[in-house]
Swiss-Prot record:
It catalyses: 2-C-methyl-D-erythritol 4-phosphate + NADP(+) = 1-deoxy-D-xylulose 5-phosphate + NADPH + H(+). Belongs to the DXR family. 1-deoxy-D-xylulose 5-phosphate binds at K121, S147, E148, S172, H195, S208, N213, K214, E217. One of its GO terms (biological process) is isopentenyl diphosphate biosynthetic process, methylerythritol 4-phosphate pathway involved in terpenoid biosynthetic process. Its EC number is 1.1.1.267. One of its GO terms (molecular function) is NADPH binding. This is 1-deoxy-D-xylulose 5-phosphate reductoisomerase. Pathway: Isoprenoid biosynthesis; isopentenyl diphosphate biosynthesis via DXP pathway; isopentenyl diphosphate from 1-deoxy-D-xylulose 5-phosphate: step 1/6. It is an enzyme of class 1 (oxidoreductase). Catalyzes the NADPH-dependent rearrangement and reduction of 1-deoxy-D-xylulose-5-phosphate (DXP) to 2-C-methyl-D-erythritol 4-phosphate (MEP).
Length: 382
């Protein structure tokens, strides 16, 4: 039985990971779970999966959690709790916690030699060089949970990486595919949250609407697969059936296809290199599929994608600024404090005003993250 710790078990990916575990209960044992605010859902998860230890946001949430439980359990709190929980004996840590909060526990888990299933974008976007350096040093398995990166991993398997011509990440184009800037000035939060194919959390859904999500995935792919940026392409594929492709030097393209269901990518990371069927996952019906279509991304309208490429080319702490500025800008948009197009404007301004630090330490990255957030919030929440 493989022992798992799931960071962020009450979020979208965390819940789907537990779906996979529920379907494959003979394969996995849950050692630890963490939830931020959702004490009631975490209580239910504890009763079902019976972990040894859990972690929550603060002491107040810990008290509420203990009140909800019949049996005593070790409850850790705060940022220290996230660092502490990965020290428990486990074969794999699933990093499904949102935001920069996922960085330190991931680094701690790698240092302890634990395999990682990564569903957090910020870890590689902000600190890819440091993290992948540790992965190589510790010789652990570091497996992507993102459907696009999982697809690339599968398309590379059994092939010579030196023969890769391009990694091709697919993007649905989000709810505003085909629109121009003038059409996007007055879009509402509700419209931006209507993703055509995937059910996800609010932050990642807005990032999909701006194409920043794809920009983050380009940066992640660079570090995960040790590939130069000019060999990582993005193509709009509205049906979200092809999850990504690898083009080889002979002109062959290998693609991974499936229905849009995150549990397929999750099970692959948890069972790697094996595959297991997860109850409820549908198979593709090629007769009913109809057309698969492809378009070039509109870098002018969806400027976040080009900002991500720019930050990645600059390196250093620029990607930490990109990430922090995006997180604050999306939060402001969700609160109706700014319009949709201002998300990219805020990020661009933050990048222009930043004095880049090359070869940053983790402390540099965390302090740049904090400074960027504070600067933007001071300006927009006066």
């Amino acid at each position: 039985m493989k022992k798992l710790i799931i960071l962020g078990s009450t979020g979208s990916i965390g819940r789907q990971t537990l779906d996979v575990v529920r379907s494959l209960k003979e394969e996995f044992e849950i050692v630890g779970l963490t939830g931020y605010n959702n004490v009631s859902l975490l209580s239910k998860q504890i009763k079902e999966f019976r972990p040894k230890v859990v972690a929550v946001k603060d002491e107040e949430k810990a008290r509420k959690l203990r009140e909800n439980l019949d049996e005593p359990i070790e409850v850790l709190t705060g940022k220290e709790g996230l660092k502490e929980i990965v020290k428990y004996e486990a074969d794999m840590v699933v990093v499904a916690v949102e935001g920069i909060a996922g960085l330190i526990p991931t680094v701690e888990a790698i240092k302890l030699g634990k395999n990682i299933a990564l569903a957090n974008k910020e870890v590689l976007v902000t600190a890819g060089e440091i993290v992948m350096g540790l992965v190589k040093e510790k010789k652990i398995e570091f497996l992507p949970v993102d459907s696009e990166h999982s697809a690339i991993l599968q398309c590379l398997k059994g092939n010579n990486k030196r023969e890769v011509s391009n990694l091709i990440l697919t993007a649905s184009g989000g709810p505003f595919r085909g629109k121009k800037k003038k059409d996007l000035v007055n879009v509402t939060v509700e419209e931006a949250l209507k993703h055509p194919n995937w059910k996800m959390g609010k932050k990642i859904t807005i990032d999909s609407a701006t194409l920043m999500n794809k920009g983050f995935e380009v940066i992640e792919a660079r570090w995960l697969f040790d590939m130069p940026l000019d060999k990582i392409k993005v193509v709009i594929h509205p049906q979200s059936i092809i999850h990504s492709m690898v083009e080889y030097v002979d002109g062959s393209v290998i693609a991974q296809l499936s229905v849009p269901d995150m549990r397929i990518a999750i099970q692959y990371a948890l069972n790697y290199p094996d595959r297991k069927y997860v109850e409820g996952v549908k198979f593709l019906d090629f007769y009913a599929l109809g057309q698969l279509t492809f378009e070039e991304p509109d870098f002018e309208t969806f400027k976040c994608l080009s900002l991500a490429y720019h930050a990645a080319e600059c390196g250093g702490t620029m990607t930490a600024v990109l990430n922090a500025a995006d997180e604050v800008a999306v939060s402001l948009f969700l609160q109706n404090k700014i319009n949709f197009l201002e998300i990219a404007e805020i990020i661009e301004e933050a990048l222009e005003n930043h004095k880049n630090i090359q070869n940053p330490t983790l402390d540099d990255i965390i302090s740049v993250d904090l400074e960027t957030r504070e600067r933007i919030m001071r300006k927009y929440l006066r």
